[in-house]
Amino acid sequence: MTKTNNFLPLMLDLSGRKIVIFGGGSVGERKAKLFSGCADTLVASLEFSQALQELGTSGQVRLVQLDLLTASDSELRGLISGAFLVIPATSNFELNQKITAIARENDILINQVDTLGSVVIPSVIKRGDLVIGISTLGHSPAVSKYTRKQIEGLVTPEYSDMIRLQDELRSYLKQHVAEQRERKEILWKVLESETVWNGFSESYEKAAERAYAIISSYLVNSNR
């Protein structure tokens, strides 16, 4: 197994990057759903799941119908050409290995579904602009799934609203508070305020109103 201490989590801008997924089943479908909104995603297979067909029809992914078992090396290379990442996700081990070998020859990143490749795709939780990736680097999918369930219970949809509010407050404070240390202190007061968090259950505006009240109180006490 690849040394897992060499892996580092990164957030990548995949705009315009070509992602090639081989396999139109459940695994390929899951990978395609992950990449469809942020990359030029191509899925190659003889048959496609219903969800993949819908993604193709809507233009979110490109579908290439091809019998991969009988496809020539040149056909596979043609699909892989220019790719940023290749994902061999067929049900045929030998075919996956063949695709992997071709990608490696061309120094293309690989996410292998049955072992560690050069790229590990984590389980992803999104709450607006908050993105959390979870991975055990292949050692325990069960622990990864359990961790995801725990975090999903903790990170509520209100986190997305708080990110929006904090971004708004940062801009406001830069105009009214010169010291970065003080701005940070105020933002933390808002972040740790139960009244602000509870305000989101009513509306974003209610939470924002309470946050600005905290800021006003701070500025008054600081004689600003």
From Swiss-Prot:
Keyword Nucleotide-binding among record annotations: no
Gene3D superfamilies: NAD(P)-binding Rossmann-like Domain (3.40.50.720), SirC, precorrin-2 dehydrogenase, C-terminal helical domain-like (1.10.8.610)
Keywords: NAD, Oxidoreductase, Porphyrin biosynthesis
Binding site for NAD(+): 26-27, 47-50
Protein's UniProt keywords contain Oxidoreductase: yes
Pathway: Porphyrin-containing compound metabolism; siroheme biosynthesis; sirohydrochlorin from precorrin-2: step 1/1
InterPro entries hit by this protein: Met8-like, NAD(P)-bd_dom_sf, SirC_C, Sirohaem_synthase_N
Superkingdom: Archaea
GO molecular function, one term: precorrin-2 dehydrogenase activity
Reactions listed under catalytic activity: precorrin-2 + NAD(+) = sirohydrochlorin + NADH + 2 H(+)
A Pfam cross-reference name: NAD_binding_7
Enzyme Commission number: 1.3.1.76
GO biological process: siroheme biosynthetic process
SUPFAM superfamilies found in the cross-reference section: NAD(P)-binding Rossmann-fold domains, Siroheme synthase middle domains-like
Enzyme class label: oxidoreductase
Protein function: Involved in the archaeal biosynthesis of heme. Catalyzes the oxiation of precorrin-2 into sirohydroclorin.
Entry-linked NCBIfam families: cysG_Nterm
Family label: Belongs to the precorrin-2 dehydrogenase / sirohydrochlorin ferrochelatase family.
Subunit structure as annotated in this protein's UniProt entry: Homodimer.
Name the UniProt record assigns to this protein: Precorrin-2 dehydrogenase
